[in-house]
């Protein structure tokens, strides 16, 4: 078995809480793993048996550069996350694809660069008279960067936010704010090779006053997912595999769910390329991940 590269970056590694338990689990199952910085131009990627993206989260500021990096690396070694999945999973427009496959998702409107931001926000609110609050987010962000919660009356400030994101070349998502999040938070489910492993509860990140919390460990706690949640998350992963025409289940993935007005689970978002997997909240999660990776590394 060759060497496995665990890809991160210098900024993100200190907040990659999964890396220490994953490295230990890799040693346990006999994987030789090295932590590598995708921004380090001196790395010889051809010497690795395979590459798995763990926390290269600076991609959000340099998406085109990151995708070009992934393409280059894919020509000299094997990406555990194949390129079609990388491109698709880093753009939250995948929510429309999930919905087309019948997966329940938060109602989502996408605004394209070149659109009139104020008109887009007003049209969205007109179509959602029940939405007392709404959320603006880029389709290509992570860690709640550039995400904001707005009162319905704040269409103009929200439109300025949308305009700024559009000017940067991002598509923008508009969604009604799901009020149950304030009471119940979200449930984030982790899967390995399509099989449920564990879940956590995460408290609300977007505050009514506009404060946006960073999802540190303080906002997370272990929580088992119920059968309805597991079924929706599994359906989302199966739809992802079907949509992309992949031959294997995803080696890892996280599906974040919230409760709709009727209490049923729906997808908030997924992390399938470089997910934080909440391994510190599961006794055996890191080992299950390492075992899934070991299966992919078999000749």
From Swiss-Prot:
Active site per UniProt: 220, 254, 271
Binding site residues for Mg(2+) 2: 269
Enzyme class per UniProt: ligase
Co-factor requirement: Mg(2+)
Listed EC numbers: 6.3.3.5
Residues holding ATP: 92, 137, 144, 175-176, 178
Positions annotated to bind Mg(2+) 1: 269, 271
UniProtKB keywords: Antibiotic biosynthesis, ATP-binding, Ligase, Magnesium, Manganese, Metal-binding, Nucleotide-binding
One example GO MF annotation: metal ion binding
Family matches, as SUPFAM superfamilies: Glutathione synthetase ATP-binding domain-like (SSF56059)
Effect ascribed to mutating residue 254 to A: Nearly complete loss of activity on all substrates
InterPro entries: ATP-grasp, ATP_grasp_subdomain_1, DcsG_Biosynth_Enzyme
Consequence recorded when altering residue 215 to A: About 5% activity on D-OUS and beta-aminooxy-D-alanine, nearly complete loss of activity on D-homocysteine
pH-dependence annotation: Optimum pH is 8.0.
Superkingdom, taxonomy of origin: Bacteria
Coiled coil: none
Cofactor note text: Binds 2 Mg(2+) ions per subunit.
Stated role: Involved in the biosynthesis of the antibiotic D-cycloserine (DCS), a cyclic structural analog of D-alanine, used as an antitubercular agent. Catalyzes the synthesis of D-cycloserine from O-ureido-D-serine (D-OUS). It reacts with D-OUS, D-homocysteine and beta-aminooxy-D-alanine.
PANTHER family according to UniProt: GLUTATHIONE SYNTHETASE (PTHR39217:SF1), PTHR39217
Protein name as catalogued: Cycloserine biosynthesis protein DcsG
């Amino acid at each position: 078995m060759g060497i496995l590269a665990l890809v991160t970056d210098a900024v993100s590694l200190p907040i990659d809480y999964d890396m220490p338990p994953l490295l230990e689990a890799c040693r346990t199952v006999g994987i030789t793993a090295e932590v590598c910085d995708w921004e380090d131009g001196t790395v010889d990627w051809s010497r690795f048996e395979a590459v798995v993206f763990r926390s290269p989260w600076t991609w959000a500021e340099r998406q085109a550069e990151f995708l070009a990096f992934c393409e280059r690396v894919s020509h000299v070694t094997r990406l555990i996350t194949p390129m079609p999945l990388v491109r698709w999973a880093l753009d939250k427009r995948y929510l429309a694809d999930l919905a087309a496959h019948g997966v329940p998702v938060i109602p989502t409107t996408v605004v394209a660069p070149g659109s009139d931001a104020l008109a887009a926000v007003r049209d969205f609110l007109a179509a959602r008279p029940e939405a007392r609050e709404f959320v603006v987010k880029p389709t290509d962000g992570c860690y709640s960067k550039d995400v904001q919660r707005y009162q319905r009356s704040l269409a103009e400030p929200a439109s300025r936010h949308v305009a700024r994101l559009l000017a940067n070349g991002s598509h923008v998502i508009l969604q009604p704010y799901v009020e149950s999040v304030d009471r119940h938070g979200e449930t984030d489910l982790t899967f390995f090779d399509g099989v449920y492993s564990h879940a956590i509860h995460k408290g609300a990140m977007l505050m009514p006053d506009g404060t946006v919390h960073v999802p540190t460990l303080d906002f997370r706690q272990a929580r088992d997912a119920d059968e309805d949640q597991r079924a929706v998350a599994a359906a989302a992963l199966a739809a992802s595999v079907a949509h992309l025409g992949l031959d294997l289940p995803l080696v890892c993935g996280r599906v974040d769910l919230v409760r709709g007005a009727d209490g049923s689970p729906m997808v908030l978002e997924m992390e399938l390329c470089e997910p934080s997997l909440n391994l510190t909240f599961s006794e055996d999660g890191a080992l299950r991940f390492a075992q899934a990776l070991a299966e992919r590394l078999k000749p």
